[in-house]
């Protein structure tokens, strides 16, 4: 069994009120993405599972390959779904998790309109469907980028910084901010029970082929035995989180979070620069870190935020904690799972 699956099993033993899911139908949208697929894995590996999991995504071929282990399981279902269009069907989902989003810099640079539509139209269509079909709770997977640029040493959930709304790169944080507000509007006007998770930069093994975020490129290089190419100074200082810890946090928010609240998701033991991240991955992979000037297109997708360190006191009050191991351990688990 891979280290990743062992990590999944640890989360399944966490003290969560799994009984809330008993007999329920759970929809995970964006199920083939890094975070969405990990949520599906935890829900399916849970030994106390007595619910149905619906994994929704645009690419059926990718989904069937990613979730091949569950193909014969009667409680697993794939649902072909593009969140930019209204959700079809008449299934009554008790819990909807919206983890659908284009979060790669190449999308920010080349398809900012589509990024905004997926975030804003996506939550609209899912909320409308949930309202019509008696949904119990909606979990929106947002981003720590909603805080914009700030001067605080560590960021809690109470205040927000500057986002340049005239910069197309702001398509991602601006649309996530708008989607959060829209979620609160559904709560106020229609009584929807909604909770929000704001993940920091998240890493793990099963990212998509099109993901060109720094961590994904670094891990690809290490797996292939190629030197890691750093295309910036690498001095941006960030909170990071292993995807299994992130998915665990989101399940704590789903099952124990207070309605109408947002929670930062980060590992306080994993605050490092991008350069340091590259060096850790290079050491694991036995390769070197080199540097190269980014192209104009790559530069357009870069975040201008230099420091993004998150306070997770609020999340920890729900009883969440990371699984045992250092950041290096979890990066190694990610790399070994892909070899």
Give the label of every model feature segment:
Residues 1-20, 50-51, 325-339:
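Amphipathic terminal alpha-helices
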Residues 26-45:
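N-terminal Rossmann NAD(P)H-binding glycine-rich loop of SDR-like oxidoreductase domains
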Residues 124-169:
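Conserved Rossmann-fold NAD(P)-dependent oxidoreductase catalytic core, especially the SDR/UDP-sugar
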Residues 224-339:
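C-terminal substrate-binding subdomain of Rossmann-fold SDR/epimerase-dehydratase oxidoreductases
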């Amino acid at each position: 069994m891979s280290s990743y699956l062992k990590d999944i099993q640890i989360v399944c033993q966490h003290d969560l009120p799994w009984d809330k899911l008993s007999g329920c139908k759970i929809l995970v949208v964006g199920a083939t993405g890094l975070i969405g697929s990990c949520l599906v894995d935890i829900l399916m590996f849970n030994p106390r599972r007595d619910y149905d999991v619906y994994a929704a995504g645009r690419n059926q071929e990718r989904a069937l390959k990613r979730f091949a282990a569950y193909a014969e399981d009667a409680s697993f279902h794939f649902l072909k779904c593009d969140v930019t269009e209204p959700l079809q069907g008449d299934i009554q989902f008790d819990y909807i998790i919206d983890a659908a989003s284009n979060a790669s810099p190449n999308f920010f640079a080349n398809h900012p309109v589509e990024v905004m539509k997926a975030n804003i139209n996506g939550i609209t269509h899912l909320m409308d469907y949930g309202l019509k079909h008696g949904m119990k709770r909606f979990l929106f997977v947002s981003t720590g980028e909603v805080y914009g640029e700030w001067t605080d040493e560590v960021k809690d959930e109470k205040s927000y910084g500057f986002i340049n709304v005239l910069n197309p790169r702001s398509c991602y944080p601006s649309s996530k901010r708008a989607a959060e507000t829209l979620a609160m509007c559904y709560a106020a006007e229609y009584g929807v029970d909604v909770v929000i998770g704001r993940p920091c930069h998240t890493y793990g093994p099963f990212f998509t082929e099109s993901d060109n975020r720094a961590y994904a490129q670094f891990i690809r290089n290490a797996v292939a035995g190629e030197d890691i190419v750093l295309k910036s100074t690498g001095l941006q200082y960030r909170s990071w989180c292993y995807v299994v810890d992130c998915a665990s946090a989101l399940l704590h928010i789903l099952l124990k979070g207070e309605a109408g609240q947002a929670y930062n998701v980060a590992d306080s033991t994993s605050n490092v620069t991008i350069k340091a991240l590259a060096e850790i991955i290079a050491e694991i992979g036995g390769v070197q870190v080199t540097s190269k000037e980014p192209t104009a297109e790559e530069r357009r997708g870069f975040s201008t935020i230099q420091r993004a360190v998150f306070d997770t006191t609020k999340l920890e009050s729900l009883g969440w904690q990371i699984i045992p191991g250092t950041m290096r351990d979890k990066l190694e688990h990610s790399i070994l799972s892909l070899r």
